[in-house]
Each structure stands twice: as structure tokens, then as C-alpha cells.
Amino acid sequence: MKRFGTYSRRLVIAAAASAGLVASAGMALADSIKVAAIYTLPVEQQWISRIHLALNGAKDRGEIEYVFSENVANTDYERVMREYAEQGVQLIVGEVFGLERAARKVAKDYPDTAFLMGSSFGPVGPNFSVFDNWIHEPSYLSGMVAGAITETNVIGMIGGYAIPEVNRLMNAFMEGAREVNPDVKFLVNFIDSWYDPPKAKESAFAMMDAGADIMYAERFGVSDAAVERGVKAIGNVIDTSADYPNTILASALWHMEATIDKAVANVASGNFEASDYGQYSFMAYGGGSLVVDPNLVPDDVATKVAERETEITDGLFRVNVNDERPVSDK
């Protein structure tokens, strides 16, 4: 696979140092920070896996002590947050899309604990920070790949829920495809689930029957359908090309390392405060990247995409953020 904007620890440390984010590069913290993560899904789930990977990386470097709870129901989430806070955990990481108000109430009750939560809303002082996978930039680039390669000019798109965090990635993908192919049309559907491969697969088959020859796989199950029908797919958040050989044209990848490194450094220095960490998922910070399969993507397409990526990382091209629900063209 050919990687565009490939994440490397060297890149993130360089970006962080230039912005005054870390005191020194490559050095483990003198005293490891106690970190706990709370996940509503298994750590194998694509979105959760990126957070888990970044935290394990910090643990392996001796920067943090890391424990986690997975498959925590929304109804039980507040209790688990309180238990970790009572245990003296210094930084609690998680995702609170289904319990925004309750999570903020817990944070208010533990002002000396730092909270970093995936959220649809903003931070709340003094200690509740938020993040999300702002990978609209590589999503745009993956759209350019799809728009250039489709032969039927019909692309199918299947998402989990029509929430801003998903919508912005799908809209960016559509804009990227239209940049290189104004004639492309989209079929869009949401399965109203974060994990229902059979339902996603069924929806994908219906789109293929309607002429889609490339599928945007925001959820698991879509790429399985693509393999069965011999059409191509675009990946999201993680690289699944090894699991679906000769199928994944490109993937927009999310790297949580920059976000975690920033939060841990702030806790260690005593400077953690409520803020929005979303920018650390941008390509300029190494928080997002594009990976393409050179065996499936022609060189001229890859070159054009790489040129656009350089413009993005140099600040010469801005990918629009559109949180509105995407809709089908036909």
C-alpha cells in the first residue's frame, strides 16, 4: 500500500514541539500518568481501536499506566466514570455521544480529574475536554480516488448514524469525488447502528444492483459485499486492505496519537484544561492520513491526489466541513 500523509511519531513530535505542546521530544515522562478509558463497544471496533492503539503506545513508552473498560452500556457509563475518578485516575478517556449531559455532570463533581471525551458538543471548564475523528481531509482525498476510477459514475455510501461526526466525512468524500468527476452520482443510506454487518451488507447489495461500482464503507459489512460482487470499496478510519485483497482502493485513516500525546503532556505538566482537541486529528498534526493501493489506483490519479494533499497540509487548500445529512442524488 502507498501511504499519503503517513503518520509517524517523528512528525507529531515535530508538530507538537513547534506549537509548544511538549517540553522535549522522544523522552518518556518522569512519572507515568494514570489513565483509564471507557468504551461502549469492544476495543476491536474500528473507531475505538484507534484510541486503544494510541493509549497502548503511550503505555509501551512508559508515559502512562493504562486500564480500560469495554462494552460499557450508556446506562452504566456514569458509574464507571465515577469509579475510575474515585480510584485516583488522572486522565479518563472515552466517548459520550449517548450521555453528554451525564458525563459533564461527573466531570463537574471531580474537578481534579482530567476528562477527554469523544463528543458532539464543546468542552466545559475546568476539566472536560472533547475530541473526534476529524478526518474529513483524507476523506476528501479518498473521494478523489473514487471519483476518478468509477466507470458507472455511481458510488454507494453506507454509514452508521446520520450524526455530524459521520456526515462530515461522507460529505467531504462526495466533494472530493465531484472535484475530479462532476458527473458522479451517489446512493446514500444509514443503517442506524454502529455494528450490524448483515444490514450494511444488504444495503450495499441493493446499491450495487442500482449500478454502484464503488462502495464507501463507513461501516463493517460493506466491504464484504464488495468482495462478493467484485466491486471496489473505500475504507474508513482503519486500513482493512489485507482483509479484503484487490478490493480497497484507498482508506482515510485516523491516528489518535497526536491527541493522546497532547493530553498526557498537559496532565503531566499540570496544564490540562477544558479545550477542543479536534484539530489534532487534522493531517497537519499527523492525526489523519490516506493510504492507497498502487495496484488498483493508476499513477496519474495517485499523483493528482498527492498534489492536493500537499496543498492541504501546506494550508493552501481547505476541505469544507459540512455536518448536514448527505442524501442520494437519485
Describe the role of every protein-language-model region.
Residues 34-61, 67-77, 97, 162-168:
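Extracytoplasmic "Venus flytrap"
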Residues 24-30:
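Sec/Tat signal peptide C-region and signal peptidase I cleavage site
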Residues 108-133, 237-247:
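Flexible loop/hinge segments that line or gate small-molecule binding clefts
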Residues 123-145, 157-162, 245-258:
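Short beta-strand elements at the ligand-binding edges of bilobed clamshell
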Residues 269-330:
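Hinge/cleft segment of the Venus flytrap/periplasmic-binding protein
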Residues 37, 89-96, 116-118, 210-220, ...:
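Periplasmic-binding protein-like
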Residues 55, 141-184, 188, 276-297:
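An alpha-beta-alpha
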Residues 2-15:
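Bacterial N-terminal signal peptides that target proteins for export
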